[in-house]
């Protein structure tokens, strides 16, 4: 199984960062794992220009590292979104990277399950997993809201959220559950 982890931790070497790296190392025992450190990539952010649909179909017109993220996502069986919670939600690094996944869809709209969604650009989309670090001032409701939002994002990206874990579980447990979920 091909696994891509988008690490949205802005601080290298933090406790959450170390946990994500350990989960990746454990997952490598059984799977092909690519760990992308979002803090080290050039991401210019989505401006909503829709150039990725019109001018350069399937690729952001800004020519940043979002193309790397899109290729990695579409080429994976499992896309793991990792972020500590900050003020009750994932980091801006992860949100910005997710916003720049829009080129992997067509601009055309279809009705699915009574809802409007973009048409798929590719035949294969990865399942989505979520690794979260609890906000020191946060609570269970923050985790629930964040998980529901990313589940919705997964649905909009022709996928589904198959797994969610909070830092504190052992990396071995999480790696095992990631493999079982996909």
Task: Map each language-model feature to its residues.
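Hydrophobic beta-strand segments of well-ordered beta-sheets in folded domains
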Residues: 1-4, 79, 124-131, 160-163
